[in-house]
Swiss-Prot record:
UniProt biased composition (Polar residues): 1-13
Biological process (GO), any one: lipoate biosynthetic process
Organism: Populus trichocarpa
Region spans: Disordered: 1-25, 47-75
Gene3D superfamilies the record matches: Aldolase class I
GO terms for MF: 4 iron, 4 sulfur cluster binding; lipoate synthase activity; metal ion binding
Family matches, as InterPro entries: Aldolase_TIM, Elp3/MiaA/NifB-like_rSAM, LIAS_N, Lipoyl_synth, Lipoyl_synth_chlpt, rSAM
Enzyme class: transferase
EC number: 2.8.1.8
The protein, known as: Lipoyl synthase 1, chloroplastic
Length: 376
């Protein structure tokens, strides 16, 4: 689920530091058993995305390359995607704090290209934090995501909600994004733990604005209710890609209609709730398919949409089909706002937890609260 949000004060990272592999082949084979077992499509001119086949598993736990993985030598990474290595005093402070409190952030776990800019505050000095709760190991194996996976991850840390709130309070941020791995192993999908974290933050710092980037909770709308009524300000859940590519890009337990159902329910469950989603580009989608997805999202009242370039974490992940130009991203922003989205963040390095537009979203939250109060 993880991988692509807006936030005010911003630091996104993931604590575990990967050890360098002994060799390229051993790294590829041991990367992630769940992900290696994900769909491996037969070579053909047409792919049946509704009935993917399961790849064979090597004796060492690795998986073979599928027809949608590997590097495409004809698709070169453009200059506009090249980033400097993260550094800076603020970056070091945030990293140390997260390690000390045993907290995870999606910035490091998902290899986000914006980690340096977010943690240091960018040109406007606004730092954005994106904390990842429920551990650092996902029960799903989406083929675009760098977060590690397991069928039976460790149980959630009961101290995580309080530690997260203490960390955020000490940083002095006023807009925080909380995301999580998928936890299909938990009865409520982790929604109760998620809600505890939000409440702990609001108790320590009532004025802080909280955005939650959630899983689909297996379509459990009661779990959605639990989180929506926890005190959060923005409910975010990513559809990730267009309808046709869902079974190729995402874990089979995820789905386009299921994600729409979650977003729709969050919107109607609480008056004034702001909803948000994200779409990756460069996976082989057509312009018409993107427009259809945008129309579906507007039909259920989604307020905020982000577009970003899909970047392949390793050769075992989905191949980049296209590097979309900054000009095309600008087009999608203009088009999205013309059809009614209240805000669209669109750019090659934009991610669902990216720090773009935090001031705008903060103002939007305040306006929505006032409108809801006036109606009631």
């Amino acid at each position: 689920m993880i991988e692509q949000s807006l936030s005010k004060p911003s630091f996104s990272l993931s604590i575990p530091i990967p050890q360098p592999p002994k060799s390229k082949s051993s790294f590829l084979c041991s990367y992630s058993k769940i992900r290696c077992e994900s769909v491996d499509y037969p070579s053909s001119s047409k792919i049946d995305a509704k009935h993917p086949q399961i790849s064979s598993i090597n004796s060492n736990g690795g998986g073979k390359m599928g027809s949608y993985t590997g590097r495409d030598p004809n698709v070169k990474k453009p200059e506009w995607l090249r980033q400097k290595a993260p550094q800076g005093e603020r970056y070091d402070e945030v990293k140390e704090s997260l390690s000390r409190l045993k907290l995870n952030t999606v910035c490091q776990e998902a290899q986000c290209p914006n980690i340096g800019e977010c943690w240091n505050g960018g040109g406007d000095g606004i730092a954005t934090a994106t904390i990842m709760v429920l551990g650092d190991t996902c029960t799903r194996g989406c083929r675009f995501c760098a977060v590690k996976t397991s069928r039976n991850p460790p149980p959630p840390d009961p101290m995580e909600p309080l530690n997260t709130a203490l960390a955020i309070a000490s940083w002095g941020v006023d807009y925080i994004v909380i995301t999580s791995v998928d936890r299909d192993d938990l009865p409520d999908g982790g929604s109760g733990h998620f809600a505890q974290t939000v409440r702990a933050m609001k108790e320590l710092k009532p004025e802080i604005m909280v955005e939650c980037l959630t899983s689909d909770f297996r379509g459990d709308l009661k779990a959605v209710d639990t989180l929506v009524h926890s005190g959060l300000d923005v409910f975010a859940h990513n559809v990730e890609t267009v309808k046709r590519l869902q079974r190729i890009v995402r874990d089979p337990r995820a789905g386009y209609e299921q994600s729409l159902s979650v977003l729709k329910h969050a919107k109607i469950s609480k008056k004034g709730m702001i909803t948000k989603t994200s779409i990756m580009l460069g996976l082989g989608e057509s312009d018409n398919e993107v427009k259809e997805a945008m129309a579906d999202l507007r039909a259920i009242g989604v307020d905020i949409l982000t577009f970003g370039q899909y970047l392949q974490p390793t050769p075992l992940h989905l191949t980049v089909k296209e590097y979309v130009t900054p000009e095309k991203f600008a087009f999608w922003k203009e088009y999205g706002e013309s059809i009614g989205f209240r805000y669209v963040a669109s750019g090659p390095l934009v991610r669902s937890s990216y720090r773009a537009g935090e001031l705008f979203v903060k103002t939007m939250v305040k306006e929505s609260v006032k409108e809801a109060a006036a109606i009631s």
